[in-house]
Amino acid sequence: MRRHRGCINLSIPLGLLAGIGVTSMAMAADAPSVHVYNWYDYIGPNTLHDFQRDSGIQPVYDTFDSAEVLEGKLMTSRSGYDVVVASNFSLPTLIKAGALAPLPRDQLPGWKNLDTGLLAKLANNDPGNQYAVPYLWGTNGIGYNVDKVRAALGDKAPVDSWDLVFNEDNLAKLGQCGVAMLDSPSEMLPVALHYLGLPPNSTDPEDYKKAEALLLKLRPHIAYFNSSKFISDLSNGNICVAVGWSGAMLEAKTNAEQANNGVKIAYSLPKEGAPVWFDTLVLLKDAPNRPQGLAFIDYLLRPEVIAPVSDHLSYPNGNRAATPLVAEATRDNPAVYPSATAMATLYTLEPLPKATERVRTRVWSKVKNGQ
């Protein structure tokens, strides 16, 4: 999971989301339904209401807060869900387990709207794009306090490069104003490997020794590893640099602007390349309401439907036809919609063999403990 989406797991009745009263919900009890499982706070405020209004299908909408919760539910029993929002990183596991149904493109007229370049990247996790529709996506990069980084490194600070955080001289200076990184070996170690010129999805233990050596050298200058605290700390000026998700950095920037506290936050997608992640719409193999599930997926493939979702959440969508409909402030922001040049440098992360996972876990433990 590569987004800050809250920390609770709850079921949201459509009536509460859309302002529909209890009476209308009761009247809809016999209506066809679709059961949807999504990340917490990860849809437009009117999307579900409008879908029910247009289709007559009642969404039953539950949320989760981690990929582990999602995979655990889908891998251990019949979940009862029709459509699930799954990360690209989870797709190989779910496909191998036979949990997903191939998508019949002839029943998804909106498929033609998808960005073929994004589909090509997603195919690294979903070969042939058989199972997953891109919903929203983002990148992992560097969020920074413009003024404090300039004060520490001068006007020529390499804010467009991973040298900002992986060069020891730079990090030693930035450490004085606070540096944070994600507490996520599956996301941080690939970035370190890539910086060293090694495959980000390497299975070679020797490569991880090199990444370990790099991070241990930097460890004294890193304030902490955490996957949520950095958002408020960055927006409040308590730290000056964080490595994390694009949407989280935009959240920090927005929070600082709303607080009018004088903190200027920017997001950089390093020129050497960075991870790109996707959240995708998948249809479960045992979906009890398959036609309604396909109808829900195709609804989200409508440009006029997905564009407001991107505006609301500040994440780009995978729908090329929707781009002109996205608010100018969103679509022209390179932190949200990277340039074609930047897109060419992005890479996806992949699940690794269990033996490599164990190596990675040991390395990360050493790095966090500084030994």
Which ranges hold each PLM region?
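Early extracytoplasmic/lumenal segment of secretory-pathway proteins
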Residues: 28-97
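Mature extracytoplasmic/periplasmic domains
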Residues: 284-345
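Extracytoplasmic ligand-binding site segments that recognize negatively charged/polar headgroups
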Residues: 91-221, 228-235
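A ligand-binding cleft/hinge motif common to bilobed small-molecule-binding domains
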Residues: 90-93, 241-262
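A bilobed periplasmic-binding-protein/Venus flytrap-type ligand-binding module shared by bacterial periplasmic
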Residues: 143-148, 194-198, 277-289, 308
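Periplasmic-binding protein-like
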Residues: 208-217, 223, 261-282
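Conserved C-terminal helix/tail region of periplasmic/extracytoplasmic solute-binding proteins
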Residues: 232, 340-371
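Short beta-strand->loop
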Residues: 101-112, 259-275, 284-287
